[in-house]
Amino acid sequence: MIKGGTGGGNTKTGLIYEGKVDLATFIAEQKNYTVEGNNVLYKDECVAHVFKKHDFYKYLKTQGINWQDHISKQLLPDNAIYVIVNNTMFILEVKTQNAAGSVDEKLQTCDFKKKQYQKLLFQLNMEVEYIYILDDWFKKPQYKDVLDYIISVGCQYYFNYVPLQKLGLPVPE
């Protein structure tokens, strides 16, 4: 199911993803995709670069960006993927839950975090998109307000789904 609670596991535009493995491993398991280091290849052509946690900051350093010049504390993304064709860094945060708890409040921080990533990447003229990949727990009615908020501040969410087409990545045949 995609954001807003509509649609379904549309394998023509994306892939079902349950967050049980990191994004690089997941992508490498898909038809015509390989991952070499941080490089994502589709049919042997580099289409993206994928980062997890501290690897994101290693990448920034290779680009001449000192994170401390822009933000006061590192944010460690679950997954970040820079898609070359649309010059966009997608921050993908996987959130799973099986009881009410701290993840509830974390969903409300996407606006702040997206702005922090924008500060880090503005010198590279990259766009930033912040996307939650949520499990079915968050389909409960008590999350309607927070899900509406996520959309209202320019962030996105999907349920158990990586929207390859939305990211600008080729969809496996």
Residue ranges and their predicted role:
Residues 93-107, 133-137:
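Short beta-strand-loop-alpha-helix junction that forms the active-site gateway
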Residues 33-85:
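Active-site metal-binding core of divalent-cation-utilizing nuclease and nuclease-like domains
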Residues 32-33, 155:
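Short phosphate-binding/catalytic loops that engage adenosine nucleotides
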